[in-house]
């Protein structure tokens, strides 16, 4: 077991503002879980291992800033630049900021929560074309666009996030592209890193209080070893951490690049389940991104897992589907022993009613609860690493795998109305939302045919079903539009 005195000797960050210290490591050498603390100016220190919340369009879905300040237990939020630059002069670049942190002011995040800015969402929506030699393809709220490394660096300098993730040439359509493409991805990322961290930019970032995390691509080590060597030998003095897109590369970093070992590791390798999070922690990840939280809340599922796992008979589910009829009269909390606002103030029957009534509060309570469950999960991991060390953590991880089902439950009800960021950018996608309007027709067969035609046309155009009918008023009048049937007419007074 290694303590902070031996690991953190050269670990204080070279850039002003951010400090990361390793308090304990579960193995003397090689990839292993580690206990640490990340400090950012004017933000609440983040004890690691921990997680960052995933935002959408600059907000944590379903939770308003005032409720974040009251109930949030996470220390940072992941933001995507493509969410804010939908037009030539975006509002985010012109907003006055009293504390000289425009991104924080624009998103109205609580003062305690740090901002982590990257070019693309995580996970990102596929673009029609891949990245170019000097630009990253992005998906804004008004369509697809390109942003160059210089433009991204200039925007970071203006927005002043607490942490900025360097530009990376990520997978476009295939997760296993040809080796020539992988080599080009590594070379581009190295070139973009040099442009992003030019001497002039380094000074500007330092004065703005921006800490830069360099990307580690999700390509084999044999292909990007030169990029990693460049980071370790030439760029390490200019970066504050690593943004890892494939945690399986961490053992190679530990074994071959000592200058990169003390840096904090932010995992952008998307975990599908809590068990995948435990594996990332065991490899040495300090901060995880957990996008499935938003998906689970949207589906109407309340998470119920803990770490260490609770003793029980049989395999337990990772969550509870709050749409099920069995919750109609249940006055129990969403999870026994949970101290979140939803569990201490309301009960299952109330949340079940809200979901069925399509009340926004239902998803808000689920989101607050689910973030609390994940916060408690990471707190349990830290306590285990602190008290039980690596052996205790591995033993409880195996027990967790035996106690809970391998997959998260799927909600059986209707999710909130899908927005643009829910779409994946795939060819010929099926409609997520049912059509809200249909063309009027006296004949049921004609009505069904007309409605289908409208929906197909909307699919082709990529728009919502039109509110206005496509026929004139005379045609509608011939079909009896707005007429009251004789037997339903209002009786004479």
Task: Place the predicted regions along the sequence by residue.
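Short glycine-enriched loop/turn motifs at secondary-structure junctions
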Residues: 138-139, 334-336
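Surface-exposed charge patches
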Residues: 154, 278, 341
